[in-house]
């Protein structure tokens, strides 16, 4: 029974991965393996030291013709809603254990590592977790930035890491890949940074978001209201 359940879950996870990668219309959307390996070898370095992303699959069929425009127009209905129409399990809140387990499961299935972050993919993840796992959305939040964005939910082991895309690379990718996710990612970010997901197992033990940026948790930070609001203001973050 357990084996069959794991197989079905793996199949659903593969469906999520395909949605995130927008297969087959655009067969790209993550940092290439070589550059992802180079980035992972320098976890302590600043975001400016990370290597720039390359355009995967730029010569594949999704980069030719007008398939991309059609995919964009049906984005909301086809990518977000089509994962599952209604929840298949009872709804429940996210917990630390669930977050850790799901983080590792996604990593084992090759889901998010090196993939460009965007609001659209954020929504796809929310929809998947709610409909397939019954986890109520609203837990997937990250620190404000700029720089590395740490998950604000303790137990979620995927952080967002900025990568640099040189102007020459942007022009080349726009020519060969139409609208590459690297461009979309920077549009979605208030600081204009291009972000990728990166797995960090140490986040299961170190609540980095809270320890470094307690002001972002507002009244839950334990700080006096005047202090956490002053910290947010100094960083240019709205306090309303």
Curated annotation (Swiss-Prot):
Self-association and partners: Homodimer. Interacts with host CD247/TCRZ; this interaction induces down-regulation of cell surface TCR/CD3 complexes.
Biased composition (Acidic residues): 70-80
The record's note on its domains: The N-terminal domain is composed of the N-myristoyl glycine and of a cluster of positively charged amino acids. It is required for inner plasma membrane targeting of Nef and virion incorporation, and thereby for infectivity.
Name of the protein in question: Protein Nef
Covalently lipidated residues, kind N-myristoyl glycine: 2
Residue ranges of the motif PxxP: 87-90
UniProt topology in membrane: Lipid-anchor
Residue spans of biased composition, Basic residues class: 1-10
Location, primary (coarse class): host cell
Residue ranges, compositional bias (Basic and acidic residues): 11-50
Pfam families associated with the record: F-protein (PF00469)
Signal peptide extent: none
Family per similarity comment: Belongs to the lentivirus primate group Nef protein family.
InterPro entries for this protein: HIV-1_Nef_core_sf, HIV_Nef
Keywords: AIDS, Host cell membrane, Host membrane, Host-virus interaction, Lipoprotein, Membrane, Myristate, Viral immunoevasion, Virulence
Acidic: annotated segments: 70-78
GO molecular function: GTP binding
This protein's record includes keyword Membrane: yes
GO annotation, cellular component aspect: host cell plasma membrane; membrane
Region span, Disordered: 1-84
Protein task: Factor of infectivity and pathogenicity, required for optimal virus replication. Alters numerous pathways of T-lymphocyte function and down-regulates immunity surface molecules in order to evade host defense and increase viral infectivity. Alters the functionality of other immunity cells, like dendritic cells, monocytes/macrophages and NK cells. One of the earliest and most abundantly expressed viral proteins.
Compartment(s) of residence: Host cell membrane
Region (Mediates dimerization): 123-139
């Amino acid at each position: 029974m357990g084996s069959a359940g794991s197989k079905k879950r793996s199949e659903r996870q593969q469906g999520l991965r395909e949605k995130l990668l927008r297969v087959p219309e655009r067969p790209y959307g993550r940092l290439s393996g070589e550059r992802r390996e180079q980035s992972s070898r320098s976890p302590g370095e600043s975001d400016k030291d990370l290597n720039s992303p390359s355009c995967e699959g730029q010569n594949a069929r999704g980069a030719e013709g007008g398939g991309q425009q059609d995919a964009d127009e049906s984005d909301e209905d086809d990518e977000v809603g089509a994962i599952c129409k209604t929840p298949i399990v009872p709804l429940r809140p996210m917990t630390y254990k669930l977050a850790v387990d799901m983080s590792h499961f996604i990593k084992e299935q090759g889901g998010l590592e090196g993939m460009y972050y965007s609001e659209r993919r954020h929504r796809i993840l929310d929809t998947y977790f709610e409909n397939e796992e019954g986890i109520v959305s609203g837990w997937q939040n990250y620190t404000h930035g700029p720089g590395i964005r740490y998950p604000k939910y303790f137990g979620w082991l995927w952080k967002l890491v900025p990568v640099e895309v040189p102007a020459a690379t942007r022009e080349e990718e726009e020519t060969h890949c139409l609208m590459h996710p690297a461009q979309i990612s920077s549009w979605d970010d208030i600081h204009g940074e291009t972000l990728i997901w990166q797995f960090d197992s140490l986040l299961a033990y170190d609540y980095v978001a809270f320890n470094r940026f307690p002001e972002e948790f507002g009244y839950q930070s334990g700080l006096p209201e005047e202090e956490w609001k002053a910290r947010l203001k100094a960083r240019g973050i709205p306090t309303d």
